[in-house]
Amino acid sequence: MCRDFAAPDRLPAMHRTSEIAESIGDMQSMINVGLVRRNALVGWRLLLNSLRLRKGRKVFAVGFNKCATTSLHGLFTSLGLPSYHGTRWRSCDNMWLFRTFDCFSDGIPQDLAKLDRLFPGSKFVLQVRDLESWVYSRLAHIDRSKRKGIYNGDLDWDTTERAVKSWILQRNQHHLFVQEYFADRPDDLLVVNFIRDPSAATRVANYLGFRGSFDRPADNVNPEKEIPASHSEMLSRCVDELCIPVQELKYDIFCPSLLEPSSRSKFPADTG
């Protein structure tokens, strides 16, 4: 009766494969344990918040949507912070929501000053993105919504020149307002480009008091890699009508050309 032995020269390779498999298994176990602990911590804090037995510091991401808000939400959760990612907090009057969660993202608040008054000691993050890719991301998002039959926008949330121009003007106004509001309180605001800056996650975590370095959560990547010609042509027309120089399309905070010469901002137009 013949016994089937592995060839001697194959044994080291088999051992290495086995060791790699064991290492991967150990890593997966560690990751799973970490996720369980994190989710348990978030759940426990949510419960304490809802029972009003805990009063965690609030963190508000006050930049626009399509600026890596999904990644920010993922980072907040990975830090063990109960995080809400959606639109219902924007009105600034949903007190149940504010009591239940610590962190809020996905869109700009209607009354930033009200949030500041209601929750003294809060931290604010202004997440930004270059104008060009931000507009394209918004247009792609609306196109997908229309294809899926779930579009419920209005005149200012559509794939039209009117909408795009209103976005650009609103972006300028909001970003400048936020920076001016916190001009005398620099420790309460962090301006960060989560898409361009590889250290963004670490900067946000450190800003919130967490030590060490942190990986950026996976981005919510737009599946449409190529920019439709209709979108690029529309943006070009809008930029021309607003007299915005082409180089300002890469600025991630505001377009200086949209300001009056007598009111040039003291703040940088880009985080770079």
Task: Locate predicted features.
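A short, structure-level motif marking secondary-structure boundaries and short turns
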Residues: G56-V59, A163, R185-D187
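PAPS-dependent sulfotransferase catalytic domain
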Residues: I31-Q170, L176, D188-L189, P198-R211
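Residues at secondary-structure transition points
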Residues: D9-R10, T69, G74, D215
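Membrane-proximal basic amphipathic "stem/tether" segments
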Residues: C2, D9-G56, I227-G272
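Aromatic-acidic/polar surface patches that form glycan- and anion
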Residues: N65, S105-I108, W167-R171, N193, ...
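The conserved 3'-phosphoadenosine-5'-phosphosulfate
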Residues: T87-N94, L131, E180-D270
